[in-house]
């Protein structure tokens, strides 16, 4: 009898344990209302807190749930059932000001987000539903910096976290950046759908000082920049893979910068398509997009070991822009002045690009900071052309302190590629197809030391000298002469 009593006691103790730990937590059980009216922040936060303590997922069922800021905790999974929508409150008072405990560029005006995770581990956001920030409710009221960035909550703000997964969810309409991941490790973003055209500064995603990152199978359309790598702290963004994405942007679809305090290292981007945005009204940039691929170091920092391959760029004004400048902006006021940064070991191949502007692509350093080691191979650029003026004697301004943008120099002296202040460049097996007659050559090299240009083909061109090497360039070997297949 004693043994039977003991067994019963153990069963009574174990049954509630096994029922509670690992059980899912439906937010409606905690009082959340799926009416699209009631602000259910407290109820949803209770479900998150219980999930963190006891295990199990937080379930957002079908329906429209209004919420203010939610704080994710350790070991939390937000799971969205089909037709579930988490809608950001339109009241700024529902987004408390929050700090992260470290300095970064923007820490004096970035305070608020719909979902926040700070210094937590093992968090997941996944499912078949939607998170919608309703960002149009927070209009920009001034052009003055930084005030124009204030009082516009992010959608996701994930800082100093490890083991983060965002999967299969739809993200829409933030008031500011859509998803900011800063100083995170082991980050996986897979299969999400993004449409972000509700406000200014509507980036698709910002990866900032993170390492060990995998981004795959994204279909995204943003008013501002697309997949964006930043370095706004003393942490480098490194060990990153991006693959199999379809991206649209009114600005730069794939972008490194502008903030580059520590820099970027060991990044692979492959098998992606950049296409025109479905949104025709551009709050920022241009409907067709500014640039397909933009690599920028202007606030110090390094950029090294970057491999980009098999990309279709269809529509932006400029397909490719690489820039080493010297804006030298501190990431906070008391930080030391950043030195000139560096760009080295960049490999770009398999680009098929259709430009919508005659500006041309460019790879440019500055006189005191040259790009070192860049390769562009097996690419095809369709260029609009149509410029009749003679630009052979045009002296391009340096503009080393200017905000970096592929359109910053205006019309370039080459219809295909302008290269300046570079040591060791290799251009191999590149086709430039000119749609209209143009007075400019396909390639201009200005202050280049070392490297090779070979197997260049031009289609539709009528100039004999399709490659122009200025007298200040040396050790540059060109073979064979470019072929004109027009």
Feature annotation, model-predicted:
Residues 477-486:
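Single conserved hydrophobic/aromatic residue that forms the stacking wall/gate
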Residues 12-20:
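Hydrophobic h-region of N-terminal signal peptides that target proteins for export
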Residues 21-43:
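Right-handed parallel beta-helix/beta-solenoid
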Residues 5-12:
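Sec-dependent signal peptide recognition
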Residues 69, 89-91, 111-112, 134-138, ...:
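Short glycine/acidic-rich loop motifs that flank beta-strands on beta-rich extracellular proteins
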């Amino acid at each position: 009898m004693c043994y039977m009593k003991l067994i019963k006691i153990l069963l009574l103790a174990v049954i509630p344990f096994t029922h509670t730990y690992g059980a899912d937590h439906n937010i409606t059980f905690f009082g959340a209302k799926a009416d699209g009216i009631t602000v259910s922040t407290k109820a949803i936060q209770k479900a998150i807190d219980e999930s963190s303590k006891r295990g199990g997922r937080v379930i957002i069922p079908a329906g429209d749930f209004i919420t203010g800021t939610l704080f994710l905790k350790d070991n939390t999974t937000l799971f969205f059932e089909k037709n579930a929508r988490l809608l950001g409150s339109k009241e700024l008072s529902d987004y408390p000001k929050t700090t992260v405990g470290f300095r970064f560029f923007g820490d004096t005006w970035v305070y608020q987000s719909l979902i926040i995770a700070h210094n937590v581990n093992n968090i997941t956001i996944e499912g078949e539903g939607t998170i919608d920030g309703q960002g149009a409710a927070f209009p920009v009221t001034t052009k003055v910096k930084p005030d124009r960035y204030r009082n516009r909550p992010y959608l996701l703000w994930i800082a100093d976290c490890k083991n983060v997964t965002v999967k299969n969810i739809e993200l829409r309409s933030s008031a500011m950046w859509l998803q900011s991941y800063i100083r995170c490790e082991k980050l996986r973003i897979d299969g999400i759908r993004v449409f972000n055209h509700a406000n200014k500064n509507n980036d698709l995603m910002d990866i900032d000082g993170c390492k060990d990152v995998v981004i795959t199978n994204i279909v995204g359309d943003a008013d501002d920049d697309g997949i964006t790598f930043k370095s706004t702290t003393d942490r480098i963004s490194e060990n990153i893979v991006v693959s199999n994405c379809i991206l649209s942007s009114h600005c730069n679809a794939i972008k490194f910068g502008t903030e580059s305090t520590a820099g970027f290292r060991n990044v692979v981007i492959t098998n992606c398509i950049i296409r025109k945005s479905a949104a025709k009204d551009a709050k920022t940039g241009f409907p067709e997009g500014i640039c397909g691929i933009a690599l920028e170091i202007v606030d110090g920092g390094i950029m090294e070991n970057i491999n980009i391959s098999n990309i279709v760029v269809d529509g932006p004004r400029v397909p490719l822009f690489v820039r080493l400048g010297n804006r030298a902006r501190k990431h906070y006021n008391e930080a030391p002045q950043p030195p000139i940064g560096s760009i080295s070991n960049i490999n770009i191949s398999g680009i098929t690009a259709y430009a919508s502007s005659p500006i041309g692509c460019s790879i440019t350093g500055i006189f005191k900071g040259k790009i070192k080691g860049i390769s562009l191979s097996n690419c095809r650029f369709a260029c609009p052309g149509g410029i009749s003026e003679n630009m052979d004697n045009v002296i391009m301004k340096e503009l080393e302190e200017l905000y970096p943008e592929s359109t910053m120099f205006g019309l370039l002296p080459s219809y295909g590629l302008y290269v300046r202040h570079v040591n060791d460049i290799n251009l191999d097996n590149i086709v430039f197809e000119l749609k209209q007659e143009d007075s400019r050559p396909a390639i201009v090299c200005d202050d280049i030391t070392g490297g090779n240009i070979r197997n260049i083909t031009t289609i539709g061109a009528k100039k004999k000298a399709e490659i122009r090497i200025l007298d200040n360039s040396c050790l540059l070997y060109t073979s064979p002469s470019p072929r004109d297949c027009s």
